[in-house]
């Protein structure tokens, strides 16, 4: 218990002193993760006015907030999560598991035959503390997201996903390269240095 308590105190200290936490509070974003997407988009311009995108594992909603601002009224943002999410202007939210037929049917109805330009995914499992198990569960979610992207993205579309480097990383990269013309890595400044998280950006879906 002492180790857990010490770790929790260290996390709380880091959180309180985190510039991105303060920026998120000031700018009205629900989580510091908003700045990761903003930085990636500044470089890669994957979201612009008119973009039609799906945000998988969207709660609490910071990526959907960013996406709604960047797509504007001419675009569309569809957010999906099994967890509840407070409403965001310009975002269509579906609560449910995106593997399930009824959820997919809702999504396809809202999409209304529009081409899907982009899928973004910042999902991570609830961590158990078992590194091997957590890594496996993380890549399972990533595989589900890749499957969704491969089925729903238009030809030429893009896919941005958070992964954790370690077991399964190279295999996942290889799977993405089979689906996308290019796959690039991104490590935004807003990612904590100690984190093994990295973002993979697949462009030009085959």
Curated annotation (Swiss-Prot):
Active site: 162
Sites where the protein binds S-adenosyl-L-methionine: 61, 63, 81, 97, 122
Major localization class: cytoplasm
Gene Ontology, cellular component aspect: cytoplasm
Keyword flag rRNA processing: yes
Domain of life: Bacteria
Subcellular locations according to the entry: Cytoplasm
The protein's Enzyme Commission number: 2.1.1.166
One Pfam family named in its UniProt record: FtsJ
A GO molecular-function descriptor: rRNA (uridine-2'-O-)-methyltransferase activity
UniProt keywords, alphabetically: Cytoplasm, Methyltransferase, rRNA processing, S-adenosyl-L-methionine, Transferase
Record field: catalytic activity: uridine(2552) in 23S rRNA + S-adenosyl-L-methionine = 2'-O-methyluridine(2552) in 23S rRNA + S-adenosyl-L-homocysteine + H(+)
Similarity remark: Belongs to the class I-like SAM-binding methyltransferase superfamily. RNA methyltransferase RlmE family.
Role description: Specifically methylates the uridine in position 2552 of 23S rRNA at the 2'-O position of the ribose in the fully assembled 50S ribosomal subunit.
Protein's name according to its UniProt entry: Ribosomal RNA large subunit methyltransferase E
Organism: Neisseria gonorrhoeae (strain ATCC 700825 / FA 1090)
Lineage of producing organism: Bacteria, Pseudomonadati, Pseudomonadota, Betaproteobacteria, Neisseriales
């Amino acid at each position: 218990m002492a180790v857990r308590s010490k770790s929790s105190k260290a996390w709380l200290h880091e959180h309180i002193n985190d510039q991105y936490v303060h920026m998120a509070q000031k700018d009205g974003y629900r989580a510091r993760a908003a700045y990761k997407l903003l930085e990636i988009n500044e470089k890669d311009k994957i979201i612009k006015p008119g973009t039609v995108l799906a945000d998988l594992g969207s709660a609490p909603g910071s990526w959907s907030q960013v996406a709604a601002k960047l797509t504007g009224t001419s675009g569309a943002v569809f957010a999906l999560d099994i967890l509840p999410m407070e409403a965001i202007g310009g975002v269509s939210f579906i609560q449910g598991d995106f593997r399930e037929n009824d959820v997919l049917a809702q999504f396809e109805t809202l999409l209304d035959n529009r081409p899907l330009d982009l899928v973004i995914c910042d999902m991570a499992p609830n961590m158990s503390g078992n590194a091997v198990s957590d890594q496996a569960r993380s890549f399972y979610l990533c595989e589900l997201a890749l499957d969704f992207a491969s089925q729903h993205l238009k030809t030429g579309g893009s896919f941005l996903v958070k992964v954790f480097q370690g077991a399964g990383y190279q295999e996942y990269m290889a799977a993405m390269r089979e689906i996308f013309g290019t796959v690039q890595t991104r490590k935004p400044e807003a990612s904590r240095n100690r984190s093994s998280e990295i973002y993979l950006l697949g462009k030009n879906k085959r």
